[in-house]
């Protein structure tokens, strides 16, 4: 009996119902709530779990390399990146017989395979890998790192190797090590790889461990570095006629500032990328010496925060008390980390397509679409998580005495103003944007398209012009040949940049019009409403006028009984739960917009987007319906095709999504009655009644059922769109 799950909570382990199992799973990672937890054990558990996380990541990436080397066509793809379809892995057991085998035998493979839409082929090719042996070597190395991570995780749980709490709370040392060690040294190492391996490979020179010390990355070696003639490293760059992967048209420069794209690969110049990473390395190596540790140089973060007195006393005691508040709250730190990571992930989505870094990836349209969508969804989940942990911080870790009249306390003091401002912005955006869309929709329906309200995004066009786009005729900053910025940049990066920004075949600063204006504001509505729900959830987490003692009920509670009317749905968890729906909705609009605009760009019929995106029926008919037709036709009387698997996933995604509503709309009593009826029938059915249960079956709690519903809704939603996106893009462009 003593070993019943969950071992971390004796109270739960003794629960006689199935609640024991579900609550056990729900709180397994909430180390703070476990029975014998101390602050020291909490930090050590989290630290050790990080090594486990690293081991999983290394194992996964090792698996990617291994399967491509074993079952892929990397070497064939390298010979002709634009026409050979990259293979992710084989399909062991294609269902539906011979037609399936034929439909999925592609990319020059001998049997059925999956095509890779992740961009790994382009990435490995760009960084200098050329053979299957290279891939196997990488897979083995990552497997080795995975094993090392597991050993390190285990080691740091042994008494002799457990770090102390003071080690975890040494913020200055940790920041210095992460800035210099993690970002600085790794960026420098990456620059080294690019200069020593990737750039030579792009010029047809194969550098490996056997000749690594014999091949000079630059004809002048380290001479220019030590004599201060750094500009020599930028001389003689690759020419515009350079044939990637060969010496034809190649130069000798290793660190350049050419700007724009390599004409053949449509990706950033590798020598520009190396230069960028060297600059990043320099910045972070300097930044990693900024904070004072036992060497006595640099700043103390606490002193910095305490010394900052806001002008005019308008922010009270400013940042006083923040150092200890943040340093003693894991949730605050996690919230900050997630917020940063969420922003970065979304920026990755935006930059991977507009400024592609990997050779030939810009011409692989399905991969471009998949990577953009993938990173935006990931960003959405990470950002909502940031606010969730911010709310938990306010409930579990916030100390009003420690933070009296500082910026945190003042945020809480004027939360009504913050929430109501977000509210009116959301209402304004929502009603005006919907009003314009509906008006335009009605005009089209009545056959008078000329009566649409179409607004040119002149401010955004002005910003694009300032960056050098000439098609709007604004003649300002970089689009004006007389401006000082234009004259200053003319000798270095500007020609390449201007060439790229005014080229019609890439995704850099696409031309925008009234359709873009409308969908931009629809997305702004989604972002502001999601933010409103998340911010309100965090700021009201400790209490509100309606429920001043809210913090005593914890992060997720359904209600405080029937005696206090109106305490349902107002826990901080409920805000997170609601916000995730809005987040998914918003990213839906973002990805619809991105995908439709790009499909028309790639097909050369941008007028379809421009004309149809100004009214709702245009989006429904000319984007969603038109592009899902192949999916709806995945199985037909003529057998299968290579899109059939996506057609099935499209259906299955809808099924999972719809299942979510079963949990979201019906609550506990319904399920409890159903369970009791099923249990009654089970106990009276021959054979079935031989199987008994130790735990009395009970329905999920309200909060848990919502989580199950939300999980189905999210997973189904994303599966459905993933199938739609990949099938509609690959069906058109291969």
From Swiss-Prot:
GO biological process: photosynthesis
Group of enzyme by EC: oxidoreductase
Domain of life: Eukaryota
Annotated membrane topology: Multi-pass membrane protein
Residue sites binding chlorophyll a B3 per the record: 662, 670
Main subcellular location of this protein, as a coarse class: plastid
Pfam families in alphabetical order: PsaA_PsaB (PF00223)
GO molecular function: 4 iron, 4 sulfur cluster binding; chlorophyll binding; electron transfer activity; magnesium ion binding; oxidoreductase activity
Entry keyword Electron transport: yes
Function (record text): PsaA and PsaB bind P700, the primary electron donor of photosystem I (PSI), as well as the electron acceptors A0, A1 and FX. PSI is a plastocyanin-ferredoxin oxidoreductase, converting photonic excitation into a charge separation, which transfers an electron from the donor P700 chlorophyll pair to the spectroscopically characterized acceptors A0, A1, FX, FA and FB in turn. Oxidized P700 is reduced on the lumenal side of the thylakoid membrane by plastocyanin.
Quaternary assembly: The PsaA/B heterodimer binds the P700 chlorophyll special pair and subsequent electron acceptors. PSI consists of a core antenna complex that captures photons, and an electron transfer chain that converts photonic excitation into a charge separation. The eukaryotic PSI reaction center is composed of at least 11 subunits.
Entry protein name: Photosystem I P700 chlorophyll a apoprotein A2
Organism: Pelargonium hortorum (Common geranium)
Lineage: Eukaryota, Viridiplantae, Streptophyta, Embryophyta, Tracheophyta
């Amino acid at each position: 009996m003593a070993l019943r799950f969950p071992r971390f909570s004796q109270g739960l382990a003794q629960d006689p119902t199935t609640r024991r199992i579900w609550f056990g799973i729900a709180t397994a990672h909430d180390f703070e709530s476990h029975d014998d937890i101390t602050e020291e054990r909490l930090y050590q558990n989290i630290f050790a779990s990080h090594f486990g996380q690293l081991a999983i990541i290394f194992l996964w990436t090792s698996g990617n390399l291994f399967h491509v080397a074993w079952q892929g066509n990397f070497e064939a793809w390298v010979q002709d990146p634009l026409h050979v379809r990259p293979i992710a892995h084989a399909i062991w057991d294609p269902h539906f017989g011979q037609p399936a085998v034929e439909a999925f035998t592609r990319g020059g493979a001998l049997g059925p395979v999956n095509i890779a839409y992740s961009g790994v082929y382009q990435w490995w090719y760009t960084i200098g890998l050329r053979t299957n042996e290279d891939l196997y070597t990488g897979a083995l190395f990552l497997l080795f790192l995975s094993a090392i991570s597991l050993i390190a995780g285990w080691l740091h749980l042994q008494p002799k190797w457990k770090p102390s709490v003071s080690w975890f709370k040494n913020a200055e040392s940790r920041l210095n090590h992460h800035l210099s060690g993690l970002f600085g040294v790794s960026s420098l190492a990456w620059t080294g790889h690019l200069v020593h391996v990737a750039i030579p490979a792009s010029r047809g020179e194969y550098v490996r461990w056997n000749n690594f010390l014999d091949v000079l990355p630059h004809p002048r070696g380290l001479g220019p570095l030590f004599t201060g003639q750094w500009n020599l490293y930028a001389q003689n760059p690759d020419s515009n006629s350079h044939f990637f992967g060969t010496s034809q048209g190649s130069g000798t420069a290793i660190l350049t500032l050419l700007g724009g794209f390599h004409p053949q690969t449509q990706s950033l110049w590798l020598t520009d990328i190396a230069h960028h990473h060297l600059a990043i390395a320099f910045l972070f190596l300097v930044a990693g010496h900024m904070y004072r540790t036992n060497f006595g140089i640099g700043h103390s973060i606490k002193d910095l925060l305490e010394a900052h007195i806001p002008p005019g006393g308008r922010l009270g005691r400013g940042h006083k008390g923040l150092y200890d508040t943040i340093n003693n709250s894991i949730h605050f730190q996690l919230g900050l980390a997630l917020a940063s990571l969420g922003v970065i992930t979304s920026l990755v989505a935006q930059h991977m397509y507009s400024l592609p870094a990997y050779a030939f990836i810009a011409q692989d349209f399905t991969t471009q679409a998949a990577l953009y969508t993938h990173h935006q969804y990931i960003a959405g989940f990470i950002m909502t998580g940031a606010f969730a942990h911010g709310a938990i911080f306010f409930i579990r870790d916030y100390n009003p005495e420690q933070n009296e009249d500082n910026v945190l306390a003042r945020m809480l003091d004027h939360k009504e103003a913050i929430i109501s401002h977000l509210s009116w912005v959301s209402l304004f955006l929502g009603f005006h944007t919907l009003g314009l869309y509906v008006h335009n929709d009605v005009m089209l329906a009545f056959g008078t398209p000329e009566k649409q309200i179409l607004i040119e995004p002149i401010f955004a066009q002005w910003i694009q012009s300032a960056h050098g786009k000439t098609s709007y005729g604004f003649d300002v900053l970089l689009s004006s040949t007389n401006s000082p910025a234009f004259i200053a940049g003319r000798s270095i990066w500007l020609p390449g940049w201007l060439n790229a920004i005014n080229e019609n075949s890439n995704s850099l600063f696409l031309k925008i019009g009234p359709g873009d204006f409308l969908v931009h504001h629809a997305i702004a509505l989604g972002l502001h409403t999601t933010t409103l729900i998340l911010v309100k959830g965090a700021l009201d987490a400790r209490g509100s006028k309606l429920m001043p003692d809210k913090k005593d009920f914890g992060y997720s509670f359904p209600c405080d009984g029937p005696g206090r009317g109106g305490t349902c749905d107002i826990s901080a968890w409920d805000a997170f739960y609601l916000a995730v729906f809005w987040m998914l909705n918003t990213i839906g609009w973002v990805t619809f917009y991105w995908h439709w605009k790009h499909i028309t760009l790639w097909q050369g019929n941008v007028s379809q987007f421009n004309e149809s995106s100004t009214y709702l029926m245009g989006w429904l008919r000319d984007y969603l319906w038109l592009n899902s037709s192949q999916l709806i036709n995945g199985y037909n009387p003529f057998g299968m095709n290579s899109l059939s698997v996506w057609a099935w996933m499209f259906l299955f995604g809808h099924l999972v999504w719809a299942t979510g509503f079963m949990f979201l709309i019906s609550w506990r009593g319904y399920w409890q009655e159903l369970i009791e009826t099923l249990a009654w029938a089970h106990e009276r059915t021959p054979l079935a009644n031989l199987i008994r249960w130790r735990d009395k079956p009970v329905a999920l709690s309200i909060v848990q059922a919502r989580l199950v519903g939300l999980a189905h809704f999210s997973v189904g939603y994303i599966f459905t769109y993933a199938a739609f996106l990949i099938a509609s893009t690959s069906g058109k462009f291969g």
